[in-house]
Amino acid sequence: RGNVDTRLRKLSDGEYDGIILCAAGFERLGISLAQYEVREFESHEFVPSPCQGIIAAECASGSSVSEMIKEISDKETMLCFKTEREIISALGADCTVPVGAYSEISDGKISVIISDRTGKRVSGVCDVKDRAELVKELISSL
């Protein structure tokens, strides 16, 4: 948490041996990482924060903007968003709790990975329609 520039300065000044930050933030801010050794993690190696990388828009329901958003909204991404938010809620987590959650839909199946604050990791796959039950099962096995 905190200012990206401050973190990078502390890394350059030797206050950190290394840091893990979200690549999307650097892309969005236009910050070059050419002077750093960079390693991207896959979701099976390092479970990201829930809903990491999902762009959300909020507006008044029933407005013209609401209708435009419906047109560009990706249904699979929305299901992943809902799944990961359900995980946050079930764990009683917020932005200060180190919980990872990642879901992905392919061929009508959703795969879910959850990592709790102790580092324990659980995962599962099911039909998209059964995602709520899968989340309950995974949470109970943590």
Question: Predicted segments — roles?
Answer:
Residues 2-142:
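Small-molecule-sensing regulatory modules
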